Structures are given as structure tokens and as C-alpha cells.
Amino acid sequence: MASPELELVRELIELNWHTRNGEVEPRRIAYDRAQEAFGNLGVPPGDVVTVGHCTAEWVRPARQDGRTLLYLHGGSYALGSPQSHRHLSSALGDAAGAAVLALHYRRPPESPFPAAVEDAVAAYRMLLEQGCPPGRVTLAGDSAGAGLAVAALQALRDAGTPLPAAAVCISPWADLACEGASHTTRKAREILLDTADLRRMAERYLAGTDPRHPLASPAHGDLTGLPPLLIQVGSEEVLHDDARALEQAALKAGTPVTFEEWPEMFHVWHWYHPVLPEGRRAIEVAGAFLRTATGEGLK
């Protein structure tokens, strides 16, 4: 049964969510400011470090048990930042008992595909170079960031780099061709995303690359040899079938995968955890998954 807060959150989204059209820069500003509606829960900006061609922010939650989480924010690849997702990445890090490195990967149109993948790979390698054991490192991302996490895992595997312990995929955008039936069947139930806008954003990111390229759309990739994945998706999302396709790709490859469909939930409901109990519960589930993958009792 959904919480009493759910309807209020849905109304707030419909009243206040940023425009789905227009130039990228105003949308970026609106996206970063959107979190102010719920606040960053007193989480101050962390130390900013250079990672190759981009930057990242260390978010150090209250709980740290020798684990590190590389967080990749959503925003259709062109929007979002560590700032817009600080309250989410911090909460997930706290639930996972991990310090969080939130990556500010390069974004289109300035830096199209595969820049974001290159940055995610560079950030993970930096963690290893700093002495983080791969078995104590995990990846997580929401929406485009979830697809990016699985893309980075494929690239790391292909390069022979030791892989992290696990990855969490929140409402993954895993098929940039936007071919899933849920783009039609759940259109009337979706309150955040618009398929036409997603296609425009995909074109901007891909800059002529085939939308089925496995490092752009991991639902079309070979996921053999990847670490365990947790996929969480809401029942009301137009990206529901992206999540299912990603699960099926993992199953086909023999990669351990846990799929969770959360009834009545919308795209990346975790982002609203300051006011939405279901968001808090989903974060706790994801955190427990990451703790288990990295060794629950280890220090």
C-alpha cells in the first residue's frame, strides 16, 4: 500500500518539475535548483577532485566502513550534477556504509558519447590507484547514470581491469533507441519523463552514434562477467521496459541480477526520499545489497 505522502509528492512534481523542452543550460540550472525543494539534508559540498577531463565530489556520509561508492547521476546525460543529486548519493552512501565519489562527467552537447563512459572508467581506475580494493568498491547510478554504470562495467571488463563488487541501477535508461513498449503502454502514467524529449536528448548525446551501441545502450550489450546487479524500477515508468531489457541481458549473460519493481512508484522516486517513505525504503534496500556485496562484517 502506498504511503500518504505519495500523492503529495506527485502533485509537487506536476507543479514544479522543470520544463522538458528548451535550451540545455537553463534546464541544467533548473535541475540543480530542483533539489532545493527538498534540501540536501544538511549535507555540505564535499571536496572536489580532478578526474581526467572532469571533476568529482567526495561525499562523506556519517557511516563509513572502508567502502567506496562511485555514483553516476542521472539527467538524460546532458543535465544533472553532483549538486543536484548530493542528497541522494549521500543517503545511499550512508545506507551502504561507504564514502561516495560523485562524478561530474562530461556532458553533451559540449562532450558527446563516449566522453561520459571514458570519465566513469577513469574515475573507477583512480579509486584503484588510490588503493581502494575492487572488492570494496561499488557503482550506482540513476536513469542515464544507471545506464552509464553498466556501460562503464563493460568497458572495464573489456580492458581487463579488476571489476567492482556490485552495481545498483535505479530506473535505468538502458536503451537510447527508446524502443520499449512501456514508452506507449505507460505514457499516461508517467509524471516525469517524456519520450520525445528522451529521443532528443539521446540524439544530442550520441551525435551520430548508433543508439544500440552497447556502451550507449547496455540493454543491447554483452553483460558476461559483470558483477552482481540490483535493478530498481517503478511500475509507472516509461523506462520500465528498459529495466526489464537490462535484466534480460544480464540473465542471458549469466550475470547475477536482482530485479525489483516497486508498485505505484515513478522515475527515480529515491530522489524524493526526504519526504517519501518509499524512497527511503528503496535506498535502504540498495544499501543493504551493496553492503552484502562488499562484505557485511568487514572493516
Swiss-Prot record:
It holds the Pfam family Abhydrolase_3. GO terms for molecular function: triacylglycerol lipase activity. Its EC number is 3.1.1.-. The active site is at 143, 237, 267. InterPro entries: AB_hydrolase_3, AB_hydrolase_fold, GDXG_lipolytic_enzyme, Lipase_GDXG_HIS_AS, Lipase_GDXG_put_SER_AS. It is an enzyme of class 3 (hydrolase). Keywords: Antibiotic biosynthesis, Hydrolase. It comes from the Bacteria. GO terms for biological process: antibiotic biosynthetic process. A motif (Involved in the stabilization of the negatively charged intermediate by the formation of the oxyanion hole) lies at residues 73-75. Pathway: Secondary metabolite biosynthesis; bialaphos biosynthesis. Belongs to the 'GDXG' lipolytic enzyme family. This protein removes the N-acetyl group from bialaphos as one of the final steps of biosynthesis of phosphinothricin tripeptide (PTT), also known as bialaphos (BA), a natural-product antibiotic and potent herbicide. This is Acetyl-hydrolase.
